[in-house]
Amino acid sequence: MNTLIDTFTVRKDELFTALVQHIQISFVSLFIAVLIALPLGIYLTRHKRLAEPIIQVAAIFQTIPSLALLGLLIPLVGIGIVPAIIALVIYALLPILRNTYTGIKEVDPALVEASRAMGMNKWKRLYKVQLPLAMPVIMAGIRTAMVLIIGTATLAALIGAGGLGDLILLGIDRNDNSLILLGAIPAALLAILFDFLLRFLEKASFKSTIITISAGILLTAAIIVVPYFASDKKEITIAGKLGAEPEILINMYKLVIEDETDLKVNVKPNMGKTSFVFNALKSGDIDIYPEFTGTVLETFLKENAKTHDPEEVYTQARDGLAKDFDMTYLKPMKYNNTYALAVSPEFAKENNLEKISDLGPVSDQVKAGFTLEFKDRSDGYKGIQDKYGLTFSNLKTMEPKLRYNAIKSGDINLLDAYSTDSELAQYKLKVLEDDQQLFPPYQGAPLMLTKTLDKYPELKKPLNKLAGKITDDEMRKMNYEVNVNGKSAYTVAKDYLKDQGIIK
């Protein structure tokens, strides 16, 4: 409890910002869903043949996994708040649509006939009789949708939309339960609060409900429109993948750019995995992010490294990006954050493990825990199978940070890692030598669209100040400061740049 209170004290400003973002996303999504589902539900009560097929389509949409839906939306609308809202609206449609249709359909036919006998036309019957009587059922659907939206909105953090999911993802990444709770508890309380408010609205008069919904529509429009008029034309956005290391790097980029130019830099840490961030760059939703040479070849260019020489691998990656994607890849830093296989110290000692080839005789004892990306890469597990002839029958896939918890608890004894991971030292893991030279060099460098550099040519000089800087050991220590000692990535980045004389 004390740790949670301490975390709250340190991060209360971040919590407030995330809470406001979460409410904005949830509020906008709910009202757009109501604007779509309520009229559609009314329409279906008058066209009953279409009702079941359309409601079934809404049900099918709700079964699409949220991560898959976000992944499909990114190439179409980019990253940020727009795809998050679209996804949340899709998930919220079913309960509102079904309850609107059911609520109106179950109004006592005798009352409808009585209103017809009094000379009311179909619109008056709807407004004066059917909707007021159906409103409790409709509001129950809206309440269900609201709770669903607030819970699912935590995933918006994966695509840079912000919200309480930022704190939850950061907690998972840092293995910090207090951070996870700092995001999860407000999300739960928010769901309870909104449910209470909507329950109160459910008991209000029909006229009051309509006025409230109308006010909500105007507020929604304001939330969507105002930020566009307030945007800063001289602002650039630098994003990073999940993890402490990308967050340190993007803060370095921010600091060197703002030190030498008049550009304002907005950073978006922990945006998501490789495909999310790269697609965001392609669509122009972000301007720069740090990418690694080996990832460029394997994931984007679908090429094997022609050599293991770092300079030649960088040149191959740089030229391929320029040709295939019209992107500029600036000079890389010194450290090589390549893949590695690491085992628990006990397993290494028991079996005298020094290099990857040593796993052959004990492969039946291996309990491997790999990331999904590593398992699917030709320079990952597929390469291990091809080049080393190793297949692990007991293999689980999991999120990057969960692997270290799993090896600590003994659930696994082998994992994939990056050579600069602070956890290698934290958990005293044994890194196995890549004796067959499977893993290519992975040097990080700023990646951007060529048109971005054409627009802001002043970016090149400050960013190239990081070229050839940061050794493996320095990066590992910086990661340790963030992941283990709890320092902010911004502070660690600033301290390094000042120590090196790169900024004043």
Swiss-Prot record:
What membrane topology does this protein have? Multi-pass membrane protein
Recite the UniProt keywords alphabetically.
Membrane, Stress response, Transmembrane, Transmembrane helix, Transport, Virulence
Phenotype of the disruptant? Deletion in strain LO28 significantly increases sensitivity to physiological concentrations of human bile, in vitro. Accumulation of abnormally high levels of bile salts, such as chenodeoxycholic acid (CDC), in the cytoplasm, when strain LO28 is cultured in the presence of bile. Attenuates systemic infection following oral inoculation of BALB/c strain mice with bacterial strain LO28. No obvious growth defect in strain LO28 in culture when exposed to osmotic or chill stress.
Indicate where this protein resides in the cell: Membrane
SUPFAM superfamilies documented for this protein: MetI-like, Periplasmic binding protein-like II
Q: Which Gene Ontology cellular-component terms appear in the entry?
A: ATP-binding cassette (ABC) transporter complex
Region named Ergothioneine binding domain: 231-504
Q: How does it assemble?
A: The complex is probably composed of at least an ATP-binding protein (EgtUA) and a transmembrane protein (EgtUBC).
Its family remark reads: In the N-terminal section; belongs to the binding-protein-dependent transport system permease family.
Q: What is this protein called?
A: Probable ergothioneine transporter EgtUBC
